[in-house]
Amino acid sequence: MMFGGVGMATLPLSLIFAFKNRPKCVITRAQYVKVMAWQEVTDLAKRSNELGSPTRRKRLEERTKVSEKCEESPADQELVFLEDDVQALNEAFPQGEKADTSWALTVLFYLAKLVFGILGLALSVIWLLHIIVFMLVNPPAFPFLNQVFIQLDSAWGLLGTTAFAIFCYYLVMSVISGEMHSIYPMK
């Protein structure tokens, strides 16, 4: 029950904030490569050299037969941060033959997140109103969504069923989002 409530807030807001924090192409890729890319690439290379190869660490661990969690934890955490930085850099400035197509798909993906975030916010408000009007008041003040689904079903046979399926699917996605949402943003 708690995960659904958390998810009804986090699912649409995380989609909207993902759009808000999307990578924005303010300068051209050529300008970016000349000015900033070399610095970021060298920083990533330095960090990866500091970490060393994971296979070398595993071989060393197998040789010594000592596995201490305290010593592995900072290196593994730094490796996760490095992978996240590389992924963000590739997303913001795609490379290769189809870089323009990749950038266009990235923009469309973030626009879809905004649209689904706004729709999700509307569905969350409607679910919350239904819970207040129909479930918390005894006797129910108004059959709200029940009446809406019946009216949609009388308009066209599958319209009410489709709307009910969308609301149920959103409720399941909200519960999953609430369960997967981390309280502390630690990795």
UniProtKB/Swiss-Prot annotation:
Name this protein carries in UniProt: CASP-like protein SELMODRAFT_416718
Major location (coarse): membrane
Domain of life from the UniProt record: Eukaryota
Localisation per UniProt entry: Cell membrane
Similarity remark: Belongs to the Casparian strip membrane proteins (CASP) family.
Keyword terms: Cell membrane, Membrane, Transmembrane, Transmembrane helix
Extracellular side: 22-100, 146-155
GO cellular component: plasma membrane
Ranges annotated as spanning the membrane: 1-21, 101-119, 126-145, 156-176
Cytoplasmic compartment residues: 120-125, 177-187
Pfam families per UniProt: LMBR1 (PF04791)
Subunit record text: Homodimer and heterodimers.
Organism field: Selaginella moellendorffii (Spikemoss)
Family annotation (InterPro entries): LMBR1-like_membr_prot (IPR006876)
Keyword Transmembrane: yes
Coiled coil: none
Membrane topology: Multi-pass membrane protein
